[in-house]
């Protein structure tokens, strides 16, 4: 009896199904890289709930205005922390197209690394200090949307924000209204009048907080 006799062998049907699955996954990767796939589906296991388009555009408009206000340095740097769907809308702005702003996405979901390879940094809030040294204290504006409504998640995300932001960084935080006390104590933030909305009508009461006087929110 050979050493391989006890090793389970996959049936021909199983091998064919596995091969088909791998081919489909590779096709999706190639479509993401080529831009054929415009929208990445939510992964609820990662607590992903995408904004509706109006919310995305309003957050982007505020981020651009805040980044360019009071600073002549160009490009102004904007960081998106766990808010990947905003990237597409930043790309549509004239300020991005003309090089007035520079964008970096800090995100756990590597699918966005395929879609936005030059602007993507893999980020896990559980390891808040695992950040590229060259990006520390570089950002004028940070827009963050921690994936979970939990104190630990917000505390660690806030730690990352403090490391990434300049001393006068402007921060927009989108999270559940129940996190208001933590937002205030951790980053001296106040609730704005803007209420983010999600494409799939997330049931939680959601709010936008800022550590500065916002420019475009009524």
From Swiss-Prot:
Protein family per UniProt: Belongs to the class I-like SAM-binding methyltransferase superfamily. EFM5 family.
Protein name: Protein-lysine N-methyltransferase M142.8
PANTHER family (alphabetical): EEF1A LYSINE METHYLTRANSFERASE 1
Domain of life (superkingdom): Eukaryota
Cell compartment(s), UniProt: Cytoplasm
E.C. code: 2.1.1.-
InterPro entries: DNA_methylase_N6_adenine_CS (IPR002052), Efm5/EEF1AKMT1 (IPR019369), Mlase_EEF1AKMT1/ZCCHC4 (IPR041370), SAM-dependent_MTases_sf (IPR029063)
Keyword Cytoplasm: yes
Transmembrane segments: none
Top enzyme category: transferase
SUPFAM superfamilies membership: S-adenosyl-L-methionine-dependent methyltransferases (SSF53335)
The keyword Cytoplasm is assigned to this record: yes
GO BP annotations listed: methylation
Cellular component per GO, a single term: cytoplasm
Biological role: S-adenosyl-L-methionine-dependent protein-lysine N-methyltransferase that methylates elongation factor 1-alpha.
Stored HAMAP family: Methyltr_EFM5
Keyword line: Cytoplasm, Methyltransferase, Transferase
Annotated GO MF terms: nucleic acid binding; protein-lysine N-methyltransferase activity
């Amino acid at each position: 009896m050979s050493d391989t006799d006890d090793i389970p062998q996959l049936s021909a049907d199983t091998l064919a199904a596995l091969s088909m699955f791998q081919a489909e996954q590779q096709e999706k990767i190639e479509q993401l890289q080529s831009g054929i796939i415009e929208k990445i589906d939510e992964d609820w296991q990662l607590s992903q709930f995408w904004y509706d388009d109006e919310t995305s555009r309003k957050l982007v408009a505020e981020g651009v205005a805040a980044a360019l206000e009071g600073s002549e340095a160009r490009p102004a740097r904007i960081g998106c922390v766990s808010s990947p769907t905003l990237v597409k809308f930043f790309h549509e702005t004239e300020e991005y197209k003309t090089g007035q702003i520079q964008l970096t996405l800090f995100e756990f979901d590597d699918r966005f690394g395929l879609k936005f390879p030059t602007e993507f940094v893999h980020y896990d809030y559980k390891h808040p200090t695992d950040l590229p040294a060259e990006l520390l204290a570089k950002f004028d504006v940070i827009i963050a949307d921690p994936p979970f409504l939990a104190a630990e998640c917000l505390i660690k995300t806030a730690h990352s924000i403090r490391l990434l932001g300049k001393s006068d960084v402007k921060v927009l935080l989108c999270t559940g209204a129940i996190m208001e006390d933590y937002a205030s104590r951790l980053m001296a933030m106040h609730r704005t009048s803007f209420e983010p909305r999600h494409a799939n009508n997330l049931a939680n009461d959601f709010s936008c907080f800022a550590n500065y006087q916002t420019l475009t929110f009524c």
